[in-house]
C-alpha cells in the first residue's frame, strides 16, 4: 500500500485511524485517503499548537473543514459517538459504535471503500477494539462489547490491523484472555493474513512484502512511547 508519511503525537492516547483508497495512476485524484485522529483534538488544540510552534503543516492544506462530533443524546460526546460521526456521517447516542439511535447498523467509510475494491486498515496506539478504531470496523450497541467487536474485526475484510488488544482474540482458556468463550479469533485472522503478537517480529514483518498484516502487540493498549522501541510514526509509515 505504501502510503503514510508521518503521524505526530498531539497528546498521550492519540488514535490514528487510516483509510487507504488506491486510485488509478495518471488522474488528478489523490492516490490515498488518510485520516488522522487526535484523541480529544479540536480547534483549540490547533490554535495552541500554532501559538507554541508558529506555522503548522495543517495550514498548508488547500481545503479545510469542520465536523461536529456531539452525540445524539448529549452535548458532551465521547469516543464512540464521536468516532461514529467521523466514520458514518451520522450522530448517535453516547457509547454506541456505528449504529443509529434505533440500533440499526450505519454504513462506514471502510464499508463504502471495500465496495469500491479499495484496501483499508487502521494503525492505533490503543486496542484495536477500542471505541475510536472500532467505529470504522464494527457495529455495536455499546463500546464495552469488545469481544463482539473483535469477532467482527476478525471476520471482516480489513487489510491492515496494527495496535493492541490480542486479549480479545484468544480463547478464554488462554492466559490473559478477556473473552468468555473459547473462540480463537487469531485463527480467523491467520487464515487471511500474517499475524504477529510480539515486538521482536515486528521489524521483519513491516519490511516484508506483505499486502496484509495484523500486528496485535499488546493485550490492551500499546505501552507508552517512552516504554517501547517503535513509534506510531514507524508503524504508520510501513502500513
Question: Where do the language-model regions lie?
Answer:
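Bacterial N-terminal signal peptides
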Residues: 12-22
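N-terminal catalytic scaffold of extracellular/periplasmic and nuclease hydrolases
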Residues: 27-206, 211, 225, 230
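Glycine/proline-rich, flexible active-site/cofactor-binding loop segments
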Residues: 7, 198-199, 236-239
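Bacterial N-terminal signal peptides that target proteins for export
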Residues: 2-13
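Soluble metallo-hydrolase cores and metallopeptidase-like ectodomains found primarily
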Residues: 212-216, 220-238
Amino acid at each position: 500500500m505504501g502510503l503514510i508519511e508521518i503521524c505526530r503525537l498531539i497528546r498521550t492516547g492519540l488514535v490514528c485511524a487510516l483509510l487507504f483508497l488506491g486510485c488509478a495512476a495518471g488522474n488528478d485524484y489523490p492516490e490515498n485517503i488518510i485520516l488522522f485522529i487526535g484523541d480529544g483534538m479540536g480547534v483549540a488544540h490547533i490554535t495552541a499548537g500554532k501559538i507554541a510552534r508558529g506555522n503548522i503543516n495543517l495550514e498548508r492544506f488547500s481545503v479545510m473543514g469542520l465536523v461536529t462530533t456531539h452525540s445524539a443524546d448529549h452535548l458532551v460526546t465521547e469516543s464512540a459517538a464521536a468516532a461514529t460521526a467521523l466514520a458514518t456521517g451520522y450522530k448517535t447516542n453516547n457509547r454506541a459504535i456505528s449504529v443509529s439511535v434505533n440500533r440499526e447498523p450505519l454504513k462506514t467509510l471502510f464499508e463504502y471503500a471495500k465496495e469500491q475494491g479499495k484496501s483499508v486498515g487502521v494503525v492505533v496506539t490503543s486496542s484495536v477494539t477500542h471505541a475510536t478504531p472500532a467505529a470504522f470496523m464494527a457495529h455495536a450497541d455499546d463500546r464495552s462489547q469488545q469481544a463482539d467487536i473483535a469477532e467482527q474485526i476478525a471476520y471482516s475484510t480489513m487489510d491492515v490491523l496494527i495496535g493492541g488488544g490480542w486479549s480479545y482474540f484468544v480463547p478464554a482458556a488462554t492466559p490473559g484472555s478477556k473473552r468468555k468463550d473459547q473462540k480463537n479469533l487469531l485463527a480467523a485472522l491467520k487464515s487471511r493474513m500474517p499475524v504477529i503478537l510480539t515486538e521482536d517480529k515486528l521489524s521483519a514483518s513491516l519490511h516484508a512484502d506483505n499486502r496484509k498484516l495484523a500486528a496485535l502487540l499488546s493485550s490492551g493498549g500499546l505501552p507508552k512511547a517512552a516504554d517501547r522501541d517503535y513509534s506510531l510514526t514507524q508503524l504508520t509509515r510501513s502500513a
